Amino acid sequence: SMHRKGVEAEKYIKEAKEKISAKPEKKFNKLKRIHLLVAEDNDLNYEVEQELLGMYGITCERAANGEICVDKFHRAEPKTYDAILMDMQMPVMDGIDAAKHIRQMDAEGAEIPIIAVTANAFKSDEEHCAEAGMNAHLPKPFDINKLMEVLTSLLDLEYTENENVQ
């Protein structure tokens, strides 16, 4: 039921927040505003991802399937998005096809970091992602700390220490 899903999401977000506040995490330098395009067909998953990213001051925009993702990227002003989080299994167009379309679109499409997010942690999946031109591969459920490491290296970000950590 929707209510139960809501409760699960709350629990998931609460646990994720506790994990983050438990150890003095670093945070992104606010001078660098990060905006992601997130291809995700599941409402609950997107809400959780948006909430977790928001804790790091990262904003995102959703595409509910691969086709919408390709279209949004195509229509956007250059440099609108810093990276794309790409769910693998989506209706209409899956993440692999969407990534291939974006890679072939233009110079920015060829360069933008695309991070695969997938429930299947199989080796063959990683190979398919790499063949489609994706830069990294993260399993679901979404581990925000792993994503931060990946974004930090792909986007060449500076971390600043959290001011409130003694």
Report each predicted region and the residues it spans.
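C-terminal compact regulatory domains
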Residues: 1-166
